[in-house]
Amino acid sequence: MPKSNTKYVIDPLSVKTSCSSEESYIRCVEYGKSKAHYSSLILLAKAILAGVFVGVCAHASGIAGGLFYYHKLREYVGASMSAFVYGFTFPIAFLCIICTGSDLFTGNTLAVTTALLHGKVSCLEYVRVMCISLFGNYVGAVSFAFFVSYGSGAFHKKEQVDKNHIFQFLNDIAVKKVNHTFVECICLAIGCNIFVCLAVYFVLSIKDGSGMVFSVFFAVYAFAIAGYEHIIANIYTLNISLMIDTEVSFTQVYFKNLLPTLIGNYIAGALVLACPLFFIYRSYYINYEKMNEPSGGSLRSISIEMKNDGGAT
């Protein structure tokens, strides 16, 4: 429990580069609460944009990884170099989403769930935000896959074997993803969204720009290189795989991968992270509400500091 003489105030002039764990949680709840204030149309636009960003960077990651999948090069560096390059390129998507204020379903599983647990959004608002976010991400990722990745022919199968390494790289990724068992896929998806939600938490905790970039980059890189399953990234990757006729089927994509990945991602954000954080920091948020009037400010421009009645702690 917070000390009786402790309160939370909004200090826009703070020079601190990071928040305490209590402050970070308060910012997370406020961030989740703000999602419900947007109209459905704005939410959809933000979600589509996030899906496009995931598609843009997944495309770039596929090309970069595929270049190192060239069979003669693999003799010297091995296939692991392709995975390293793929993972190193993909985090740019999350930096794009953060800097533009776009809306990603997987991050919402933490932030909006904490707001729901505190009663800051209703069950109906919660379902609205989560469904629009997922649908918009799907539309954005699949649209980019069709109009840019498929339309450009970047991943198409080539007649010459020496030029077929990019197609083969994507094919091998897709085949691996659909050959997990249902339970394996859920477990990999849980691991993935722990990293993604922590990346969101880092953004809310770290106020220094370079520190935020590094923390987000390595959190996302960790899940990408580990082979975890991310629903929005998989929506892009597996749908472009279907479009270019790789060795996967529609049933495998949607029922052996996307469905369990969705379940696992939600479990990670809502149950593995949101519920324990709510249990640990619930009293701090309640105290924050009692001691402070709503500021109406933007979370990007304010700092929540802990101060007592006599001055800064």
Curated annotation (Swiss-Prot):
It catalyses: (S)-lactate(in) + H(+)(in) = (S)-lactate(out) + H(+)(out); formate(in) + H(+)(in) = formate(out) + H(+)(out); pyruvate(out) + H(+)(out) = pyruvate(in) + H(+)(in); acetate(out) + H(+)(out) = acetate(in) + H(+)(in). The keyword Cell membrane applies. It is a multi-pass membrane protein. Residues 69-77, 150-185, 233-260 are extracellular. Keywords: Cell membrane, Glycoprotein, Membrane, Transmembrane, Transmembrane helix, Transport, Vacuole. The chain crosses the membrane at residues 48-68, 78-98, 129-149, 186-206, 212-232, 261-281. Pfam families: Form_Nir_trans (PF01226). PROSITE patterns: FORMATE_NITRITE_TP_2. Gene3D superfamilies: Glycerol uptake facilitator protein. Monocarboxylate-proton symporter that mediates the efflux of the waste product lactate in the intraerythrocytic parasites; active in acidic-to-neutral pH range. Transports L-lactate. Belongs to the FNT transporter (TC 1.A.16) family. This is Formate-nitrite transporter. It comes from Plasmodium ovale.
